[in-house]
A protein has these predicted regions:
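Conserved acidic residues
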Residues: 66, 102, 152
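Conserved nucleotide-sugar phosphate-binding/catalytic loop shared by glycosyltransferases and other
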Residues: 35-81
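Short N-terminal targeting/anchoring amphipathic segment
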Residues: 94-111
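Short Gly/Thr/Asp-enriched flexible loops that form oxyanion-binding sites at enzyme active sites
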Residues: 108-125
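Structural motif
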Residues: 9, 37, 106-108, 130
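N-terminal subdomain of nucleotide-sugar transferases
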Residues: 1-43
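Active-site-proximal region of nucleotide-activated glycan assembly enzymes
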Residues: 125-178
């Protein structure tokens, strides 16, 4: 049986650090072919203190399949974020069509993550969402909940978030707290 192809999306520098243990575990398994897509603000020097180093660090960690996806527009206002999210859907759809992953994994609540989740949903690709159910009181919270509704597998980071996911109607068999 061929290995399952997992596409892990990283759209900010901090998500590299937060996902490192997961990436290492996925990468060491023979039954998984791991692809990491770096995009969004993870590729912009203005937002990433270690600009350009995410790819280098992934390579040093032994990740073989690394893809860069440029779709973030310059600026920091609502119009730019909305346009970036739209462009991101287009770019992620192309990437997913080329890679044909069995599963896409996203983390968080940013507009770039929503782009990946939306593309995966429309392409009928299974989606895992890490950090669903968290609350922030910001616009990002609505985006997080939208991503939750697009996801098939939910990985909460605390029990309160797991309970919120269940109250949102998610299948208890697909909701986990790690």
């Amino acid at each position: 049986m061929p290995p399952r192809k997992i596409c892990f999306v990283i759209t900010s520098f901090i998500h590299y650090a937060r996902n490192l243990l997961i990436l290492e575990e996925l990468n060491r398994r023979d039954d998984i072919e791991l692809h990491v897509v770096i995009g969004g603000t993870a590729l912009l020097s203005k937002y990433t203190p270690r600009y350009g180093q995410v790819r280098t660090m992934l390579e040093e960690d032994g990740i073989e399949h690394i893809h860069e996806l440029y779709f973030a527009l310059e600026g920091d206002n609502r119009v730019v974020k909305a346009k970036t999210a739209g462009l991101g859907i287009v770019e992620f759809a192309t990437m997913f069509n080329d890679l044909k992953p069995d599963l896409v994994v996203v983390r968080g609540d940013r507009f770039e993550v929503l782009s990946a989740a939306t593309a995966a949903a429309y392409m009928n690709i299974s989606l895992a969402h890490i950090e669903g159910g968290d609350i922030t009181g910001t616009l990002d919270e609505s985006v997080r909940h939208a991503i939750t509704k697009l996801a098939h597998l939910h990985i909460a980071t605390n029990e309160a978030a797991r309970e919120r996911l269940l109250r949102m109607g998610e299948d208890p068999r697909s909701v986990f707290n790690f």
